[in-house]
């Protein structure tokens, strides 16, 4: 019973944003946290970097550059998603169009928020990220835990629980429903 779109293999366009310590307030400034729906946050992702003071696109911000338009894989620096634990940051990136984020490391809470929102966070060393950033498209194979460019393949680690959720398209509710008969049995025993 898939509740979210499963991730098995994914081929997508990349955009590099090699800043370290990108915090959740830089991903989605708190001024935009006025709704509880998961949608509608994409236009505010990286708001302070993405737009000039007059509201026009910042041409120096990589995701705004023509060669990166439509990118669905973000390759970034270390300690991505640090700061406050707002799930809105994951919502904003997902709504922007990212399906996979490759970083040197992630904040633990942000990592979990990605998986809960059907985004795959991948940890790779800097040399691997720099190599992958040379290409327009790369491919991710979650069951085999690899990220590939046309000429090289990199292995990544992921906890089996998160991998199972993403490969099978399971959210927390779908996982709970797998144990429905055991829950009902326990409730009857009370």
UniProtKB/Swiss-Prot annotation:
One of its GO terms (biological process) is L-leucine biosynthetic process. This is 3-isopropylmalate dehydratase small subunit. Its EC number is 4.2.1.33. Belongs to the LeuD family. LeuD type 1 subfamily. One of its GO terms (cellular component) is 3-isopropylmalate dehydratase complex. Pfam families: Aconitase_C. GO terms for molecular function: 3-isopropylmalate dehydratase activity. Coiled coil: none annotated. Keywords: Amino-acid biosynthesis, Branched-chain amino acid biosynthesis, Leucine biosynthesis, Lyase. SUPFAM superfamilies: LeuD/IlvD-like. Pathway: Amino-acid biosynthesis; L-leucine biosynthesis; L-leucine from 3-methyl-2-oxobutanoate: step 2/4. Heterodimer of LeuC and LeuD. It comes from the Bacteria. It catalyses: (2R,3S)-3-isopropylmalate = (2S)-2-isopropylmalate. InterPro entries: 3-IsopropMal_deHydase_ssu (IPR004431), Aconitase/3IPM_dehydase_swvl (IPR015928), AconitaseA/IPMdHydase_ssu_swvl (IPR000573), IPMI_Swivel (IPR033940), LeuD (IPR050075). Catalyzes the isomerization between 2-isopropylmalate and 3-isopropylmalate, via the formation of 2-isopropylmaleate. It comes from Staphylococcus aureus (strain MSSA476). It is an enzyme of class 4 (lyase).
């Amino acid at each position: 019973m898939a509740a979210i779109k499963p991730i098995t293999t994914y081929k997508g366009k990349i955009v590099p944003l090699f800043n370290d310590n990108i915090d959740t307030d830089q991903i989605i400034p708190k001024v935009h946290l006025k709704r509880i729906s998961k949608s509608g946050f994409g236009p505010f992702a990286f708001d302070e970097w993405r737009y000039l003071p007059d509201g026009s696109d910042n041409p120096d911000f990589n995701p705004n550059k023509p060669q990166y338009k439509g990118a669905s894989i973000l390759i970034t620096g270390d300690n991505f998603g640090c700061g406050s634990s707002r799930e809105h940051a994951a919502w904003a990136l997902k709504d922007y169009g990212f399906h996979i984020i490759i970083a040197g490391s992630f904040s633990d809470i942000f990592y979990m928020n990605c998986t809960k929102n059907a985004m795959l966070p991948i940890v790779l060393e800097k040399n691997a990220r720099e190599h992958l950033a040379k290409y327009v498209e790369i491919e991710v194979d979650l069951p085999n835990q690899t990220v590939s460019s046309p000429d090289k393949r990199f292995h990544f680690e992921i906890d089996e629980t998160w991998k199972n959720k993403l490969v099978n398209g399971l959210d927390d509710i779908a996982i709970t429903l797998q144990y429905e008969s055991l829950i009902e049995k326990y409730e009857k025993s009370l």
